[in-house]
């Protein structure tokens, strides 16, 4: 019986802040929070990868089994480099193409 590969989910997240948040700073904050909450082993199982960032909206990738955990990580981010922020998941999809299409329609 064939083994199915790892399924991925793509999460669109929006950053609310009075100041501009850089792409690198956001993705580093997410990665640091993953390591803080779940450790190195959990971080490897989550399969987190930054994909895209533009105008305060980012797309990240994770393993489909770890979507609730990555949502918890994102909700725990309250500041990035001393800048107070609120980060929220706005949409989840199985493909980048569909996710971008849904974001464009909103």
Predicted regions and their residues:
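RNA-recognition motif
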Residues: 47-54
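Arginine/glycine-rich "motif VI" loop of SF2 helicases in the C-terminal RecA-like domain
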Residues: 78-83
């Amino acid at each position: 019986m064939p083994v199915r590969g790892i399924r991925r989910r793509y999460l669109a997240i929006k950053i609310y802040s009075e100041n501009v948040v850089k792409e690198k700073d956001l993705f580093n904050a997410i990665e640091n929070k993953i390591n803080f909450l779940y450790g190195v082993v959990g971080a490897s199982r989550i399969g987190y990868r930054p994909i895209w960032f533009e105008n305060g909206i980012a797309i990240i990738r994770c393993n489909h089994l770890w979507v609730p955990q990555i949502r918890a990580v994102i909700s725990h981010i309250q500041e990035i480099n001393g800048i107070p922020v609120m980060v929220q998941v706005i949409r989840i999809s199985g493909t980048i193409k569909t996710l971008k299409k849904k974001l464009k329609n909103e």
